[in-house]
Amino acid sequence: MKRSAFFISDGTGITAETLGQSLLAQFENITFSKFTRPYIDSVEKARAMVQQINKAAETDGFRPIIFDTIVNQDIREILATSNGFMIDIFSTFLAPLEQELTEHSSYTVGKSHSIGHNSNYMERIEAVNFALDNDDGARTHYYDKADLILVGVSRCGKTPTCLYMAMQFGIRAANYPLTEDDMERLQLPAALRAHQHKLFGLTIDPDRLTAIRNERKPNSRYSSYAQCEFEVREVENLFRRENIPHINSTHFSVEEISAKILVEKGVERRFK
């Protein structure tokens, strides 16, 4: 079964998309076509949005699922005329919370991601810059400032995990790709030895690694199953020999991988 899902907001759409994606992930047997539509902040945009939703409904033969964080009542009423199933994220959770706290919420556009009111903004930017500057072993002389250093074979998910932890939690995470030479020596590169307490390993199933590498360099030694199987086997041997905690990333989302790493290493999030 195929269904369409829209994440609609008069702000950035981050809240609608994040929560909506998490909810849809619980329905593994349904394929969703997902559309994020931020800054739907005028009557004209809302009417155009209704046309998109209705077209998706006609194409799919099912009502699209709509996750929205729209504040403006006029815009919400226009969206409600569409042939979609609407889930108002804020009102769903705020109404019972207001009752419990006996306080009205400041239901304002972009409140949860407002730069002006978010003391974590600079921490987030600095963490992302750190992850980018220290990606793929490009620099190693700033590892003393890292909260974590992810290690593993090429294309096992190190970079997206580092960026996710930076964006979501302000974690300064570097990553270092272990090469064939490192594996044959069965010892950590010199750049990592002084920071072994910060290391966390990522591994991956060889067949999945083969598929990923074939998208980048098809029909090469780098992407061959034999090479991928060798690298995975040897890097896991290295992790065990050096007592480096590690996780197989094959069947986990980047959110799950990040959470497991932070728990295992006991690293505190800079913001929550």
UniProtKB/Swiss-Prot annotation:
Identify the InterPro entries for this entry: Kinase-pyrophosphorylase, PSRP
Lineage, top-rank taxon, reads Bacteria
Q: What is its EC number?
A: 2.7.11.33, 2.7.4.28
Does the record's keyword annotation contain Repeat?
A: no
Where is ADP annotated to bind?
152-159
**Which stretch is the leader sequence?**
none
Catalytic reaction equation(s): [pyruvate, water dikinase] + ADP = [pyruvate, water dikinase]-phosphate + AMP + H(+); [pyruvate, water dikinase]-phosphate + phosphate + H(+) = [pyruvate, water dikinase] + diphosphate
GO function term, MF aspect, one? ADP binding
Instruction: Provide this UniProt record's keywords sorted from A to Z.
Output: Kinase, Nucleotide-binding, Serine/threonine-protein kinase, Transferase
General function of this protein: Bifunctional serine/threonine kinase and phosphorylase involved in the regulation of the phosphoenolpyruvate synthase (PEPS) by catalyzing its phosphorylation/dephosphorylation.
Q: Which PANTHER family match?
A: PYRUVATE, PHOSPHATE DIKINASE REGULATORY PROTEIN 1, CHLOROPLASTIC
Name this protein carries in UniProt: Putative phosphoenolpyruvate synthase regulatory protein
Source species, please?
A: Pseudomonas fluorescens (strain Pf0-1)
